[in-house]
Amino acid sequence: GGPLLNMKGQLIGINSSKYAGVGIEGINFSIPLDTINYVLNQFEQNGKVIRPDLGVTLENSWEARIGLPTKKGVTVKTSSSSSLSNGDVINSINGVEVHSIVDFNKALRDTYSSGSINVIYTRNGEQISTDIVPNLK
């Protein structure tokens, strides 16, 4: 690992691993700076990383899976939540639109402080707003 810098020399992440093989030049993986800052702040405040969890397994749209821009939300694949069901499409978390699982996780991480989380989702064509108290893991 080492610093990942943009063209201006600003730190944007930390290189964490590299995949190389026969006939492959090499693929590098990095941890984004906002994730590093989140983890460091969590350790400073709590002595461990605490993450809100809504008890759902999600599935990206096919557009999001292949990296295309999309306005679709993320689909609930499985749920242990009393509010969300399999097949629901989550559109926003605390007012932040989500179009991929990465967006969902970032919105949870960046907007949750305590109490409940407002989730707007679509079920059978109807848009529904609900507040959910997450499990903290």
Show the residue positions of the predicted features.
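Short, well-ordered loop/turn sites that connect or cap secondary structure elements
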Residues: 5, 84-85, 111
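Extracellular Ig-like/FN3 beta-sandwich strand-entry sites
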Residues: 114-116
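Residue-level detector of beta-strand face positions
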Residues: 3, 118-120
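Active-site loop architecture of trypsin-fold serine endopeptidases
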Residues: 1-40
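PDZ/PDZ-like groove recognition
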Residues: 42-107, 120-122, 126-137
